[in-house]
């Protein structure tokens, strides 16, 4: 008759215990919980920086249009501005706007609102506005940010507040 140690000798396999696997999963979960908000903030900040760059281009082109024509380009005068903005032209709201994945851009003229460039952040469905970035006639060097409704995430609210406080990112 064989003793117990002889029977189990061929089962001497090196492996992780269930506790060790649970500890690894827990550590990965904690790291993901810490890293995900930072990643989301970096992505949204990158989107906002890109929008600010395009917004400044629209404002500069609109100011050049003003010098040549004595008035700012309105919502229907997008083609008159001497700039290329990547995206598709959207005329569904009246006038011309450039729609990208994340923003809708337009020169708005200096009418009642006093904007010379406007970028509206939209969620993926593109229907509602989350926040808008704009440049006004009164202070063309400063970027302004205004939240729209309750759709903005906490990250978007913080970044918008930062832009509003500093005038840029």
Predicted regions span which residues?
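N-terminal secretory signal peptides that target proteins for export/translocation
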Residues: 1-11
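Generic hydrophobic/packing signal
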Residues: 15, 26, 46-49, 54, ...
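Alpha-helical interaction segments
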Residues: 28-30, 54-56, 95
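Periplasmic/extracellular, small/polar-rich flexible segments of pilin-like filament-forming proteins
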Residues: 67-169
